[in-house]
Amino acid sequence: EYSSKTFISSKENIVRTHLFLILLIGFCYGQLFELNHDNDTRIYWVDYPDNATEPTPLVISMHGRNQSLLSHITYSQMSNFANPQNIAVVYPQGINSSGLLAWNTGVWWDNSEYDDVGYLNAIIDSVISNFAIDTNRIYACGMSNGGFMAYELACELSDRIVAFGSVAGNFMMNV
């Protein structure tokens, strides 16, 4: 039987678990960053190859709706492939829309006040200023709603991002 106290307690445990996992991942690889964009503080994770000796390609890898950067790092396994190839990966976090983390594109999005294209463009600028990135080899991909966002970036940031990929994300006609 659930009470409000049980719900709060379980919610606190979920938060503690996520914080523990973020710290654990931090000791393994990567770095968590905060970025203030449009008066919101948002986060993203960068996994930069340890042995890079020259500017590296950058992959922007976006989670699906109701996922997080942490869950995406875990299930995508992108860093396991990218790091040995001297490829940097950035995992941005979507914004909370109706209680779910999502990107402001696709059929479920109902709040146009967030500029995720601007946010992702600012992440690219930040990563370039903090790491040695080959600016001619920036890529974007995503799962589901993150794939929708990859298509959005293909239309909006094609001057910066050279290739795009989507897994289980449709190209939306309004893009």
Give names to the regions the model predicted.
Residues 1-15:
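N-terminal secretory signal peptides that target proteins for export/translocation
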Residues 17-27:
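Sec-dependent N-terminal signal peptides
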Residues 35-48, 54-139, 152, 156:
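Serine-hydrolase catalytic machinery in alpha/beta-hydrolase-like enzymes
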Residues 136-175:
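Primarily recognizes the serine-hydrolase "nucleophile elbow" in alpha/beta-hydrolase
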